[in-house]
Amino acid sequence: RIDKMGVVLNYGQVPLIKSRYLQYINNEEHPYGENVIVAIMVYGGYNVEDSILFNEGSLKRGMFRTTYYNMYEAREESSSVRGAQRDTRFANIQKEGAIGIKPGYDYSHLDEHGLIRENTEMDDKKVVIGMGSVSIHNDGGQMRDMSVMPKKGQLGFVDKAFMTEGETGFRIGKVRIREERFPSIGDKFCSRCGQKGTCGLIIPEKDMPFTKDGIRPD
C-alpha cells in the first residue's frame, strides 16, 4: 500500500536513558529521535526564548535529516452524459497524439502505461500520470489530455509507480515521490520530554564553542 504522505527520520536512535514503559510501545523498534550533544548557554543572541542554534557540520553529516513521501493517484472511469459516452484511461499522451497537451510540461518520462518511470528526478514540470479522455460525440473520438500534474515546487525522485485494479474493474495508478529534506531556520524541534523550540541559526562548525577536550555541541 502507499500512504497519502509520510515523513521518515533517516537516522533514528533509541534514547540512552529508558523507562519501563518503552517495552510496551516498541520504541526501540521505531526510534523517533536522535541523541545529540547540547550546550545550555547564551551564544550570539540568536537562541533567546525557545530558539536553538545548530552546528552546520552535524547537519551535513545527516543529523535530523528526513525523507518526505507524497503520493499521486488517478483512476480510470467511464461515464455517460445525455447519451454521450466518455471514457478516461491511462495512456502515454505523446504517443497517442492527444489534443489539449499543456505547454511547458514534460511528457517524455511516461512509460507505455502512462506512469512516470521509477527513479526519475522530479520537478514541477514533469507529468506524473498520463491520462486521456475519449468522447466520440464531442472530440470525434480523439483523445484529450487529462494528465495528473505535480504540485508547484515538487522536487525529489520517483520512489514507486504501480498500477492495480479496483473493485469495479477499472485500473488505479499510484506514484510515490520521495524528497530528502534538511533542517533549516524556522523548523521546529523538541526534546524527548516535549520541550519545543525552533531553529534560530545554523552556525559553521569552526565557529561553534568547544570544551577543553575539543567537544563541540550539535
Regions found by a protein language model. Name each.
Residues 1-218:
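Conduit-forming functional cores of very large proteins
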